[in-house]
């Protein structure tokens, strides 16, 4: 694969000084190429391995090119590689978070980012549409989920049913959006480039004010009330808090919709634990959003005590310790081993607790978790919202247990981050 990339770079741009794959879940390479006596610092973005994306890779390149042509600070595009499917862009300077920054620096950067969003949202969508930029939203994710679904997924069916029963009126709002907002590099004062445009499309501009609420739990963007007021000032348009909340809920579903199939049947190269962590964390955000909509209090269930060590406890512990490493590939396996170790300790009891909850709801106790998932999905599809206030706490308990099975108690993998209150 790298030899094909090297050949394309040499034939189209110049001699390659360095080509190195980034250690991450998506195929990405960093390249240094000499052209006209200077070194081009490039990034080669490849296709996902675990799902094809709701928009094809060509769509990402198209939107990025159109934005760049209109002065939006995104990396310049150098071209498309047919094999492996990838496109070549500039590497951009700056840092992706606020480590080492003062509060004033962070706020200045965020004000600049909001300015960029406001200017993006003011662009005429007609040239983007004419060039082939799509409309989409969560419906694009649902289409992939329906086409690739491999097993019952009662929580997703519950959430999608809620969205169908409570459609959002965008009141004519439409613009080019990045959707997966909050991803950029900065120099401590200004944004140097907006990054990761794989979800960019034509949609409601308020999608961009909602999506990065989840990433805020990791990055820390500052006070959202202040930022929303700043966006209103910069754009001249009011921020509809109810619409933002609706878009936030819809965006919390995108991980599970995207990775349902990859978690049910992981393809080679899939980062199972990263996908599982993303899904478990954002599923909790989703059920918490529903609880806010419905005014339902949530309480995390008590976890069962660890069972007596099984026959697998010693070899599992040995496996975990053998995989403890900073190497990316070993780290993936280390996390998977710790998940299996924790399941060996309390997994069976968590499954039994889930089935006990279903017995109360259904009036009968399913025999297995598979039977339970199928019965619960059948119930929520037929229920059509009649028992939403009963189902939200039930799903919260199930999702909380699933989240806590990802690793040892208190580990980073089992830590659930709370969203900032923007009400």
Language model features: what each stretch is:
Residues 15-19, 237-245, 369:
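Short, surface-exposed acidic
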Residues 206-239, 249-295:
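Active-site activation/catalytic loop segments of kinase-like enzymes and analogous catalytic loops
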Residues 321, 325-331, 335, 342-423:
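C-terminal amphipathic alpha-helical interaction region
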Residues 24-33, 38-39, 43, 77, ...:
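Active-site acidic catalytic loop and adjacent metal/ATP-binding pocket
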Residues 18-134, 143-155:
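ATP-binding pocket architecture of kinase catalytic cores
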Residues 227-239, 309-324:
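Short amphipathic alpha-helical segments and their helix-coil junctions
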Residues 2-12, 16, 125-189, 236-238:
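An alpha-helical support segment within catalytic cores of ATP-dependent transferases
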Residues 291-317:
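Charged, amphipathic alpha-helical linkers/stalks
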């Amino acid at each position: 694969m790298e030899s094909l990339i090297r050949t394309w770079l040499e034939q189209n741009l110049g001699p390659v000084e360095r080509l190195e794959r980034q250690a991450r879940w998506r195929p990405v390479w960093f390249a240094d190429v000499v052209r006209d006596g200077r070194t081009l610092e490039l990034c080669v973005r490849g296709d996902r391995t675990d799902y094809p994306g709701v928009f094809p890779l060509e769509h990402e390149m198209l939107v990025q090119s159109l934005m760049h042509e209109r002065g939006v600070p995104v990396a310049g595009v150098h071209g498309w590689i047919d094999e492996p499917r990838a496109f070549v862009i500039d590497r951009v300077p700056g840092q992706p978070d606020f480590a080492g920054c003062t509060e004033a620096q962070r706020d200045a950067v965020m004000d600049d980012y909001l300015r960029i969003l406001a200017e993006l949202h003011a662009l005429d969508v007609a040239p983007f549409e004419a060039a082939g930029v799509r409309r989409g939203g969560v419906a694009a994710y649902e289409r992939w989920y329906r086409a690739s679904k491999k097993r019952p997924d009662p929580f997703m069916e519950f959430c999608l049913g809620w969205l169908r029963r409570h459609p959002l009126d965008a009141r004519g709002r439409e613009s080019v959006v990045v959707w997966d907002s909050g991803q950029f590099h900065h120099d401590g004062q200004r944004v140097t480039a907006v990054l990761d445009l794989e979800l960019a499309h034509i949609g409601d501009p308020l999608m961009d004010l909602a999506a990065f609420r989840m990433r805020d739990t990791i990055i820390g963007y500052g006070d959202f009330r202040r930022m929303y007021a700043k966006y209103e000032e910069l754009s001249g348009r009011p921020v509809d808090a109810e619409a933002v909340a609706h878009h936030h809920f819809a965006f919390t579903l995108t991980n599970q919709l995207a990775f349902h199939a990859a978690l049910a049947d992981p393809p080679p190269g899939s980062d199972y634990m990263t996908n599982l962590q993303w899904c478990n964390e954002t599923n909790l955000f989703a059920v918490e959003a529903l609880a806010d909509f419905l005014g339902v209090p949530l309480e995390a269930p008590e976890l069962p005590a660890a069972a007596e060590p099984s026959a697998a406890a010693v070899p599992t512990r040995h496996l975990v310790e053998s995989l403890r490493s900073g190497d990316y590939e070993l780290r993936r396996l280390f996390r998977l081993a710790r998940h299996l170790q924790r399941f060996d300790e309390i997994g069976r009891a968590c499954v039994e607790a889930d089935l006990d909850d279903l017995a109360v709801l259904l009036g009968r106790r399913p025999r297995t978790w598979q039977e339970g998932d199928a019965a619960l999905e059948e119930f929520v599809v037929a229920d059509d919202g009649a028992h939403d206030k009963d189902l939200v706490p039930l799903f919260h308990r199930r999702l909380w247990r699933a989240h806590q099975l990802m690793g040892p108690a208190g580990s980073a993998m089992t830590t659930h981050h709370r969203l900032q209150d923007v009400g």
